[in-house]
């Protein structure tokens, strides 16, 4: 009941153009979450919690729209804002 789109990069993107430019299948530095969509409450969090331990990256970062909803979602789910860019926000999730 949830969908997430990811890309693997060695640089944190701040735009969708940079995401396309930096994406490499064999990158290990960052997993970038750029779409999280759920069909019910709690499923976005569930899919992120399920995927994080499986992705084998050093860091887990979002490329998020500049919306209050994105800020609320990521902060509520334990992420820290690490980038306030012209077109996007970046949040980082840390495995505990």
Annotated model-derived regions:
Residues 1-16, 32:
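Conserved beta-strand in the GNAT
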Residues 1-5, 78, 89:
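Short intrinsically disordered, low-complexity coil segments enriched in acidic
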Residues 87-96:
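C-terminal "cap" of GNAT-fold acetyltransferases
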Residues 16-78, 83-84:
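Acyl-donor binding region in acyl/amide transferases
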């Amino acid at each position: 009941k949830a969908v997430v789109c990811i890309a693997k990069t060695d640089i944190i993107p701040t735009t969708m153009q940079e995401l396309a430019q930096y994406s490499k299948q064999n990158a290990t530095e960052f997993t970038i979450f750029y779409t999280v969509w759920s069909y019910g409450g709690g499923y976005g969090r569930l899919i992120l919690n399920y995927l994080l331990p499986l992705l084998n990256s050093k860091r887990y970062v979002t490329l998020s729209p500049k919306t209050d909803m994105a800020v609320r979602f990521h902060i509520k789910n334990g992420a820290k804002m690490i980038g306030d860019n012209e077109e996007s926000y970046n949040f980082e999730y840390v495995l505990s």
